[in-house]
Amino acid sequence: MAIHADTHDDLRLFQTGEHACGYWSDRQARDLVLDPHDPRLGALYPQALAWGFRRSGDLVYRPHCERCRACVPVRIAVDAFHPDRSQRRCLARNQDLVVRVVAAERTEEQLALYRQYLQHRHPGGGMDTHGAAEFDQFLIGGWSHGRFLEIREPAVDHVPGRLLAVAVTDVTEHALSAVYTFYAPDAAARSLGTFAILEQIQWARRERRAHLYLGYWIEGHAKMNYKRRFNALEAYDGRHWRGLPAAQGSAR
């Protein structure tokens, strides 16, 4: 099938076959995928984000399930965001950490943390065997304009501290997109997932980017609840982005 992309060309969309849902074990899923061979893909990606799509490797996709519409694209309106009490505590708890934005180029230290995270979060699921090739394919891709937000413990004697988290982030003219975040399992008390989003918001604000895309939110799914705790959250209904009230709860 095809949708109109501009006044001259059509952008082709492909529909995948059904596959196991990554969120509900008793459901099947399928996706719409932008033509991965379209040479305009990098240029079209910012608009695709605004249409509710997301990047995984070189693929730009959106859930398109036959009997389920649970996956809702969400983003934060950066200038309107203000951290709540729980998020302020998260920032205070992590004020000793060193945060920097680096090139999206894999290091052995990042790969080791990625594998540690997957082995802890997804044991036996296939992802826990990922190596360097899968890291590059899944997180970096061939055409995206991405950066890594690194979070580290403080340096000691001018030696960089231990790497605690990496937030893979796509950069477009008007927005950032949170692609994937992985962090040290033994640092769970720091709520590094929430801290990474708070730092991405600050990054977007510094560079005058209007939105931070958070991917998909699923109402009632425990692993997705943290996204509702951010105020200035907007959801895409297939035609328009509309504001959502923030839910209350502790930072993950």
Curated annotation (Swiss-Prot):
Keywords: Acyltransferase, Cytoplasm, Transferase
Major enzyme class: transferase
Primary localisation category: cytoplasm
One GO cellular component, as annotated: cytoplasm
GO biological process: proteasomal protein catabolic process; ubiquitin-dependent protein catabolic process via the N-end rule pathway
Cysteine disulfide partners in this protein: none
Compartment(s): Cytoplasm
Pfam families: ATE_C, ATE_N
Gene Ontology terms, MF aspect: arginyl-tRNA--protein transferase activity; leucyl-tRNA--protein transferase activity
Catalysis performed (reactions): N-terminal L-glutamyl-[protein] + L-leucyl-tRNA(Leu) = N-terminal L-leucyl-L-glutamyl-[protein] + tRNA(Leu) + H(+); N-terminal L-aspartyl-[protein] + L-leucyl-tRNA(Leu) = N-terminal L-leucyl-L-aspartyl-[protein] + tRNA(Leu) + H(+)
Protein name: Aspartate/glutamate leucyltransferase
Species annotation: Xanthomonas campestris pv. campestris (strain ATCC 33913 / DSM 3586 / NCPPB 528 / LMG 568 / P 25)
Name of the encoding gene: bpt
